[in-house]
């Protein structure tokens, strides 16, 4: 076993090599404080025939890592939690650009959290563990990467804060990359205020992150290189194209290729290129269909890049900084609390807002919290197949849908003034031609306002792209699906006029330089200003229907009265909810009663509850200690019998009192009893 210790960027990491999981291609035990992660890489020796990178990343949390047993009926880990899926995506998006373009060997990277001490950052630890395991595997010529998190407390940036410091921060910036450039960025604002970060400060934070990554990656390469396995798969020379076929495409089918490029819909574009491939295949049998498709893809990509970089024009004829036409409609769904239809070009998001009570909040188990945590603001993103013209079934929520919903949530969360309010936004993507997550942010912000939710400001989102060729590059505002597919960067940025509340950057290159990112940030600000102007105009036309929105009424009763509102087995509370069609949250320790629903029904419910409690008090006042009564058995329970009293109300005759007198009762019996006490609004009885 080899044991390695590396200290950099405010952390000391320990790596135990060749200790466990030795049948994997490579494996290691990563340790930071009391956080321990097992990282393994497994590679199959036979490549797949399809043209894609068969990489799978799985991040798994074990409950025992925090000394806990899983909640719920089944006491073992089951379906992956949201945090596990989002962390898997985070690692995948960092590592994927590092692989050679022609790498086709099925590869699985598994990260198992075996111990977690709460204070250390699981996502940074997991990515660094995955990077080290992948670098040591030497399955291909892959650079070393690392991750860091940047927080901001006051005016000070902090590298790799612990959980306590991050909870005080107004910024959560996660960055990964090599020693030369950045591969992936996730950012959100934190705190009770909006805390949007201005572009110059964002650049400063990214510079700090890059400095940290350079230090860590340099150490990783120096220390891990002697421990690498033998290189398994050398990078090939790539695809060798038939020049005669390329000339044929450029000379005889160029106009049709341009027509396909300029087709705005994905389904229409695919039909054009499929038809070109079919024609060539029928006319030139010497070329295989696969060869034709690859050559067609190369010509298409070359022409798109030439069009953008040299001619400064995009496939849909827009200028580089031009945003597609925007149309905003509101109040489409009469029964929802709000609904906004946001259309930008051929991308369309219908966001529906619903307000709820504490009982409606989503609960999650987490290694970092002893008790389940409540998610009060939920943003769910759905991408049905018909939005891109595909005929396929709608299945379970995909990783992509979860990730896009999480991004939109992060963009909007700090714009909400009352963080205790329970809100669910659902984005239904009805059409998609790029930037659907950012359309969801725009529609979601307006949906919050239309729901009567107090917000600090409207938030707009825009997806930026980049096309590069050698030393030349072009930044694109509001990218389409084609520009996303053929471009080198997908940089989603959301915020208001003052700054950024969330962003996410992915690249298909080995990394992006800071100066390019800053150019994209400034260009995105212009696009955001344009979109926000249209959103503010739409906001002025929104009429909030307060009579339809749920009202919340909060009042307090004596804590011992809460059990009276609940009733035996929840009978009373169920009857109240069914009768008035409201939602009720009860807090036993404080005696707080929260009612939510239609305003008129809420007020009637409050009146009913107070009158009900008052009537119970009056019933108690009719009886005195040691008073002898003739009562009737109402119902028998395990611990005794409830008796109907002659002047109203009921009392409890406990089982031990019945046993002492050797009395056997059945429902309907009449019996003499004596009042012995009043306990929390209950009358306790004994046999007379």
From Swiss-Prot:
Q: Which domain of life is it from?
A: Bacteria
Gene3D superfamilies per the UniProt record, alphabetical: GHMP Kinase, N-terminal domain (3.30.230.70), K Homology domain, type 1 (3.30.1370.10), Nucleic acid-binding proteins (2.40.50.140)
The prosthetic group or cofactor this protein requires is: Mg(2+)
Q: Which residues form the signal peptide?
A: none
* InterPro entries recorded: ExoRNase_PH_dom1 (IPR001247), ExoRNase_PH_dom2 (IPR015847), ExoRNase_PH_dom2_sf (IPR036345), KH_dom (IPR004087), KH_dom_type_1 (IPR004088), KH_dom_type_1_sf (IPR036612), NA-bd_OB-fold (IPR012340), PNPase (IPR012162)
Cellular component GO terms, alphabetically?
cytosol
Q: Which residues form the S1 motif domain?
A: 626-688
- Which cysteines share a disulfide bond? none
Q: Where does Mg(2+) bind?
A: 484, 490
What name is this protein filed under?
Polyribonucleotide nucleotidyltransferase
Regarding protein family, the annotation reads: Belongs to the polyribonucleotide nucleotidyltransferase family.
Which residue intervals define the domain KH in the entry?
Answer: 550-609
Q: Which molecular function terms from Gene Ontology are attached?
A: 3'-5'-RNA exonuclease activity; magnesium ion binding; polyribonucleotide nucleotidyltransferase activity; RNA binding
Listed under GO biological process in this entry are: mRNA catabolic process; RNA processing
The record's keywords, sorted A to Z, are: Cytoplasm, Magnesium, Metal-binding, Nucleotidyltransferase, RNA-binding, Transferase
Catalytic activity annotation: RNA(n+1) + phosphate = RNA(n) + a ribonucleoside 5'-diphosphate
User: Is-annotated flag, keyword Repressor?
Assistant: no
Instruction: Tell where it localizes.
Output: Cytoplasm
What PROSITE patterns does the annotation carry?
KH_TYPE_1, S1
Q: What role does it play?
A: Involved in mRNA degradation. Catalyzes the phosphorolysis of single-stranded polyribonucleotides processively in the 3'- to 5'-direction.
Q: What is its EC number?
A: 2.7.7.8
Which SMART domains does the annotation name? KH, S1
Record carries keyword Heme: no
